[in-house]
């Protein structure tokens, strides 16, 4: 049961699966980022090293931002609450020997912003371009910082960074037609600014069910389609105007969505999906 840790509050224990997956994975990435940051001269003028240092700083910021949202309330009104243990390239050896006290929420967000500010500075200076969407480009760094400012309720700065991200990116939003059918699954689509290309040979694919499509894809085999359906409340569904394309991202009260191709509707009906099930995400090569 993927939800038992949360249901019995054991997800706060260091031995829980949830802790290993989230806390463990993110701090392992921070460990790697710290190694890069501690190796590269912070004031380097080498374009390649500037690029690598920016990657490490941006990823470390993203990881701490993810952690602080998982393990503490939002920023606004909780600035003095306990935040994350901030392990860096400067204190890693000391932490390994003696542990690390938690910083406050304010200190955690200050640290995140400092990393992002430096990453943006480096990505502005470097002439090296990414060759894969998995890497952080200047537009992505602005986008991450915009999200941080949103979490801090600093909407003016969030708007500035969102506009900067749009100005720097070559990505374009999905059209209404694009999202009027199950989609949001192809990293090659020009709407995606940042993400990892997953192949059929990757471990996350070969597991069959331990992946995002399994949990969120109602139109393919996985946890969702055998009973773990993701659903919207009837009340919220009724609030979505008929003219809003997002209404079709869910089955209606009769188990039908105007967004679904005939084969997809036949599939979801055959699976006896309950009313108001989410059908937003497509499947590989439209193999219903």
What are these regions (language model features)?
Residues 32, 108, 115, 122, ...:
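Alpha-helical solenoid repeat scaffolds, predominantly canonical TPR units
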Residues 6, 159-288:
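Hydrophobic-face positions in mid-chain alpha helices that act as interaction patches
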Residues 24-26, 54, 59, 79, ...:
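Start-of-helix signal in alpha-solenoid helical-repeat scaffolds, especially tetratricopeptide repeats
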């Amino acid at each position: 049961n993927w939800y038992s840790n949360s249901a019995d509050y054991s997800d706060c224990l260091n031995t829980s699966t949830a802790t290993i997956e989230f806390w463990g994975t993110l701090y392992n990435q921070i460990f790697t980022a710290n190694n890069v940051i501690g190796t590269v001269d912070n004031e380097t003028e080498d374009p390649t090293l500037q690029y690598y240092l920016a990657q490490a700083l941006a990823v470390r910021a993203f990881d701490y931002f993810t952690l602080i949202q998982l393990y503490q309330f939002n920023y606004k009104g909780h600035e003095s609450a306990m935040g994350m243990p901030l392990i860096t390239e400067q204190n890693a050896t000391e932490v390994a020997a003696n542990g690390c006290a938690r910083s406050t929420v304010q200190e955690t967000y200050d640290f995140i912003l400092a990393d992002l500010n430096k990453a943006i500075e480096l990505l502005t200076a470097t002439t090296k371009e990414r060759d894969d969407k998995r890497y952080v480009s200047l537009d992505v760094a602005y986008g991450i910082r915009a999200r941080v400012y949103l979490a801090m309720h600093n909407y003016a700065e969030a708007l500035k960074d969102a506009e900067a991200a749009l100005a720097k990116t070559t990505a374009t939003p999905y059209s209404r037609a694009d999202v009027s059918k199950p989609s949001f699954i192809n990293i090659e689509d020009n709407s995606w600014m940042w993400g990892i290309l997953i192949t059929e040979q990757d471990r996350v694919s070969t597991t069959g069910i331990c992946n995002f499509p399994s949990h969120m894809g109602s139109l393919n085999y996985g946890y969702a389609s055998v009973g773990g359906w993701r659903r919207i409340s009837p009340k919220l569904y009724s609030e979505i105007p008929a003219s809003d394309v997002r209404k079709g991202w869910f089955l209606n009260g009769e188990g039908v969505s105007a967004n679904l191709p005939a084969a997809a509707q036949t599939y979801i009906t055959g699976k006896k999906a309950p009313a108001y099930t989410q059908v937003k995400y497509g499947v590989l090569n439209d193999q219903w």
